[in-house]
Structures are given as C-alpha cells and as structure tokens.
C-alpha cells in the first residue's frame, strides 16, 4: 500500500496542466455502446483507476476496448454482439457502472446490471434512473442484488420530470432516449458541463439532443449511431483543486486548461475571499495574499457550488480568519473528512448538514486517512500548509479521480512524496 508524505510550508509556484474530466469520460465511454457502426476514439482521457474499471465493464459486455494510457486515448468498437449483463465484480467498484443500463436498453431492449458501489458518501439512490426507464416503457425489477430491465417493443419517447436534477439519471435517460422511437423531453435535469459534453458526443455520433446545460433537454430518437472521435473536456474539479493548492500556500501558479465557464460559483467564492484569478484563453493565473477573508459556502446542484469541491474549500477556509459555515445540501454523510482535519488541529465542528470553522487554524502534521476521493485531495492540501509532516493513507480513493497528483504538486515546489509502506 502507498501513502503520501508531505512536509508543509512550501509556497507553490509554476505551471500545471489539467487532465480530461473523470466525470465526463465515464458517461462518454458508456455512451460508446450506443454506436452500432464503426468505432469511437476518445482522446484527452485521464489515466485513472475508474477509467480502467469502466473499460473492463465495456469489455465484459463484449465491446472491443483498446486503452493507450501514454496517448490518453481509448478505442471502443461496440458494433459487436453485445452482452446484456454488467456483473457485480466491476459495478461494485464504481457507481458510474450503472450508466451502461441506458445504452444496453437502447441497443438490446434488455439489461441486467448489479446494484452499484463507489464512494461511501450517502445513499445516492438510483430511483431517478429507474423512473426514467419506466417512463420510456421499460419494465424494471430488482432481484438478488441485480436490476433487471426489459422492453417488449423497444423504448418510446415521452415526457419525464426528475424529482431532483440527478447527474447520473440525466445521463442515463439521455442515452436510453437517443435510440428510442419519437421525442423525449426531460425536465429538471442536471446542468453540469459533463452533461453538455455527453450530449455533444451523442450528437457527433448522429444523435439529436438539444438543451443540454439548461433545465430541459429534448431528445429526438434516431435509428442508429456511429462511432466518432471525441475529445474529453478538462476536469473542472481537478482545476478547482489545483487553484486551491495555489491559494492555500499563498502561491503563484498558472493552471493550464482551467475553463472559467465551468467554475463560476467556485470562482465567485474564491474572489470573495481575496484570491486573485487572472483568466486567460488557455487557463488561469492564481495568486493569493496572506490574509484571506471568511466566507460561507452552500453546496448546490450545478451551477451552484459543487459538492465535489466542498472538502477542498474547507481546507482553504481553515487558513482564513473569522467564522465560516459550510452547508452540504447535495449528499448526506459528506463530512467524514472533518474528523481527519481535527487530527491536524483544525478548529471545526459538524452540526447536522453544516460544518462550522472558528478562526484561523494552526494546522499541524498528523497521520490521516482519506475517507473518499475529494477528501483525499483536501487532506493533502491541508498538509501543504501544516506545520511538520502529514501522512495521508487510503490512496485508492485519490487514484480514482486524480492523475499523479503528488507529482503535479511536487513540480510546483511542494515537499511531497508517495511511498510504499
């Protein structure tokens, strides 16, 4: 097993590049199953364990998958005779595996998918997915830990209203509806940039999806889709994490490929704190002064403040004066990292769905464990400014969403190593 060891106190300077988006590449890879002709080539693919997992799922479904990690490219040929079952062995590792259900229903008219796994942050129910599939004409039942879905006469377009703008449900329903008969209108959808990227990919394959990025998405079903080449958008969460790494060390860093339009709520909060963000065509220069102002943060569905930046923002707020409140409205049970911050002498408490930070914490190095993907990054950020040595374990979480995170920080001047123990 590996751990990351950080000696705090170094100011970060230099330039760092953002990878392709984890939360965009996974649905785009599953959408490749929709193409009954040709092969798809996906580029700007990040070298993450989740990408390997979803590739294994696609291979299990009998798609031909070639992954060139050096080039950051994946070739997917789904013109084969697809299998209907995504087994627990892979689906249990990652929730995004549920996203094969929409494409399988669309292509085959039936699918068997194990109930998903992934990060342990809240219930993350899949009722919205099931509700959407049923509205399109699928019959669903749960048995022995599997979801069984089938249609008698194929999927048919309809009007669907989501109870909550679930990202996964929005993606799954778009994919299912892309080959359905007629028009589907989905209201109260998720508006994340990753939804827009998926819609763009399906349209490049010959689909007809409009309205992605707004409250309502319309899909006109087509008879077939074909493989194409598509470049994955930059990862706005990695970009945000690297921006905070610069700010927390009061550094001077250029984050290449950070997209301003993808991070408006985070930018607003950082600028409110006094972080300087100079956006250019190809990225952003980040600088910060010693004294940052306190702000309150509330996570919300996009375009609100992203829940995936909550723990990193807590790390930064620990270094600012004053009273700060962070309220989590998207996932329950997403303050497990607070106990680890407290091991580092953080003055932070949790009350219900809010975390409260009193004053500026004099962070001290400690041995801490990552509780989920974003918490792993946040604890490393705290270690950058803690007095003494911080050791972060449970790096399997980190590897699900960040490529060579410690190497990137090291290139900017951090005293950080990844060691086997």
Curated annotation (Swiss-Prot):
UDP-N-acetyl-alpha-D-glucosamine binds at residues 95, 124-128, 308, 330. The keyword Methyltransferase does not apply. Its main location: cytoplasm. Pfam families: EPSP_synthase. GO terms for molecular function: UDP-N-acetylglucosamine 1-carboxyvinyltransferase activity. One of its GO terms (cellular component) is cytoplasm. Its EC number is 2.5.1.7. Phosphoenolpyruvate binds at residues 22-23. It is found in: Cytoplasm. It is an enzyme of class 2 (transferase). One of its GO terms (biological process) is cell wall organization. It comes from the Bacteria. The active site is at residue 119. The modification 2-(S-cysteinyl)pyruvic acid O-phosphothioketal is found at residue 119. Belongs to the EPSP synthase family. MurA subfamily. PANTHER family: UDP-N-ACETYLGLUCOSAMINE 1-CARBOXYVINYLTRANSFERASE (PTHR43783:SF1). Cell wall formation. Adds enolpyruvyl to UDP-N-acetylglucosamine. NCBIfam families: murA, PRK09369.1. This is UDP-N-acetylglucosamine 1-carboxyvinyltransferase 2. It comes from Staphylococcus haemolyticus (strain JCSC1435).
């Amino acid at each position: 097993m590996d751990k990351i060891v950080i000696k705090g106190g170094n100011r970060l300077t230099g330039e760092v590049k953002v990878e392709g988006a984890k939360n965009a590449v996974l649905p785009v890879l599953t959408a490749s199953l929709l193409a009954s002709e040709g092969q798809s080539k996906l580029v700007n693919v990040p070298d993450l364990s989740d990408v390997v997992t979803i590739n294994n799922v696609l291979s299990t479904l009998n798609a031909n998958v070639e992954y060139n990690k050096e080039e950051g490219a994946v070739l997917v040929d789904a013109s084969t005779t697809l299998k209907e079952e995504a087994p627990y062995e892979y689906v249990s590792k990652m929730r995004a595996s549920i996203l094969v259900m929409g494409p399988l229903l669309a292509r085959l008219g039936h699918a068997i998918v194990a109930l998903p796994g992934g990060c342990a942050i809240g219930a993350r129910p899949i009722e919205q997915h099931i509700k959407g599939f049923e509205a399109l004409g699928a019959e669903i039942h749960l048995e022995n830990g599997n979801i069984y879905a089938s249609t008698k006469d194929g999927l048919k377009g309809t009007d669907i209203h989501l109870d909550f703008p679930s990202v996964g449900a929005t993606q799954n329903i778009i994919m299912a509806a892309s080959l359905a008969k007629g028009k589907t209108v989905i209201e109260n959808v998720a508006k994340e940039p990753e939804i827009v990227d998926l819609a763009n990919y399906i349209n490049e394959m010959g689909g007809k999806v409009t309205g992605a990025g707004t409250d309502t998405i319309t899909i006109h079903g087509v008879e077939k889709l074909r493989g194409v080449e598509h470049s994955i958008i930059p990862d706005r969460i990695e970009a945000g994490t690297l921006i905070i790494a610069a700010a927390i060390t009061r550094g001077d860093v250029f984050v290449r490929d950070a997209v301003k339009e993808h991070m408006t709520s985070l930018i607003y909060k950082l600028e409110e704190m006094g972080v300087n963000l100079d956006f250019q065509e190809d990225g952003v220069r980040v600088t910060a002064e010693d004294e940052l102002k306190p702000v309150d943060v509330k996570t919300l569905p996009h375009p609100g403040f992203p829940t995936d930046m909550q723990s990193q923002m807590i790390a930064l707020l620990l270094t600012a004066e004053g009273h700060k409140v962070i309220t989590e409205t998207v996932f329950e049970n997403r303050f497990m990292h607070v106990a680890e911050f407290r091991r580092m002498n953080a003055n932070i408490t949790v009350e219900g769905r809010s975390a409260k930070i009193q004053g500026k914490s004099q962070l001290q190095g400690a041995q801490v464990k990552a509780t989920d993907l974003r918490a792993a990054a946040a604890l490393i950020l705290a270690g950058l400014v803690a007095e003494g040595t911080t050791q972060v374990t449970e790096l399997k979480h980190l590897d699900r969403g960040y490529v060579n995170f410690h190497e990137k920080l090291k290139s900017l001047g951090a005293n950080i190593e990844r060691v086997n123990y």
